[in-house]
Amino acid sequence: MLSSHYQGTPYDPYASYGARENRGVYRSIGINRNDFVALIQLRPDLPADLQAVEWVAYASNALNAMVPFYANVETTPAYLAGTTGEVSTDSFYWVSRMIAAMADASYGKSVFHVERYELRVLSACRALLNQ
């Protein structure tokens, strides 16, 4: 839902079909102007220390991948926590921003690769959570 950009309608700003004047008429949620999104997942069937998971993603919601964080952790791997003002591929934040910037400029050619990346990240994260 938070990555919606009116896919399949004449109002999709990334569409290559329909009347050009309709594209982007309505501001969609999933545009490359977002910077951060978080969702809280509560799993009451698990032990208390595993129940709350915060899923976080950076950059455009239409072009990002969410990763989970347990609510009760004290440290985070550097790749996920080490965000600085210097652009680097050593930071999940900056990688997410770079993917969004490049894919936004060539959406039609890039969306397939971005969707595969999103699914692989989600699958790997779910596997970690289910260990």
Where are the predicted features?
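C-terminus-biased signal that marks the final domain/tail of proteins
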Residues: 1-131
